[in-house]
A protein has these predicted regions:
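N-terminal exported-region signature
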Residues: 3-19, 23-38, 44, 49-241
């Protein structure tokens, strides 16, 4: 009900008088004094439903894990800073768009640095991304400070400020820098299924080819890299590759 505040972890904000558990169905539906926000906590639920006109915010350093399905026709926003990120894990199916505000480093004109390696955690077109975030992305000559790596040439290829086509590829990494150290918004449907990333080997006979591929996390959540406690962590799952 949001009677006291927007704090998900405050029992007085819930109609049941209890903080949701992994067995609960959470419906954010109706008119509330305060819309819910998950802040500095790891929230759980069995099912989450956010209806039209309602919002749910997951702040940096916070997470929401849904063991069942996630349905959104309202507005669900995940935030981040330079050092901290939010996480949304859905074990079942997910429907509706989410917004992930991803912090990206400021371009350093003196050193040519400040680039971050990023991946879209949602399905989104390049054109829509540039339209929504173009004013935040650094421009270098006639190109954005937003590029993909071409391992056939061993070069980074920047996106031009002219109109772009195509979509972000799930699991493919990109490099990016912003004008002032700010967030860029990725808006679209989140991935929930396992993703297989094609690794391209361009190691040509003349020695100028490249084998490097920039593989990135395609989910709005954390992936265990090589944690011993992580079930099917990334390194173990790909040990035969």
């Amino acid at each position: 009900t949001g009677t006291t505040s927007s704090d998900w972890a405050d029992v007085s904000n819930w109609s049941t008088g209890a903080i949701p558990t992994s067995s609960d169905i959470v419906a954010i539906d109706g008119t509330f004094t305060n819309e819910p926000s998950i802040s500095s906590t790891d929230a759980v639920a069995k099912t989450v439903i956010v209806t039209t006109g309602n919002t749910l915010t997951i702040d940096e350093t916070s997470s929401l894990t849904v063991s069942g399905d996630f349905t959104n026709t309202g507005t669900v926003t995940l935030n981040s800073t330079a050092d901290d990120y939010s996480s949304l894990i859905v074990t079942g199916t997910a429907s509706g768009d989410i917004v992930y505000n991803r912090y990206v480093n400021v371009y350093d004109d003196t050193l040519g640095g400040g680039w971050d390696l990023v991946c879209s955690p949602v399905g989104m077109s390049i054109a829509d991304f540039i339209t929504a975030n173009g004013s935040n992305i650094q421009v270098l000559d006639d190109d954005y400070a937003f590029s993909q790596f071409n391992n056939a040439t061993g070069q980074w290829e920047r996106y031009a400020t002219a109109e772009q086509t195509g979509n972000f590829e799930a699991g493919k990494g990109y490099s990016m820098a912003t004008t002032g150290g700010s967030t860029v918004a990725f808006t679209g449907a989140m991935q929930t299924a396992d993703q297989s990333i094609n690794i391209i080997n361009n190691n040509g006979l003349n020695g100028v080819g490249r084998r490097w591929n920039l593989v990135s996390n395609p989910f709005p959540s954390y992936i265990n890299g090589n944690a011993a406690a992580g079930t099917n962590n990334f390194m173990d799952a790909n040990s035969a590759v």
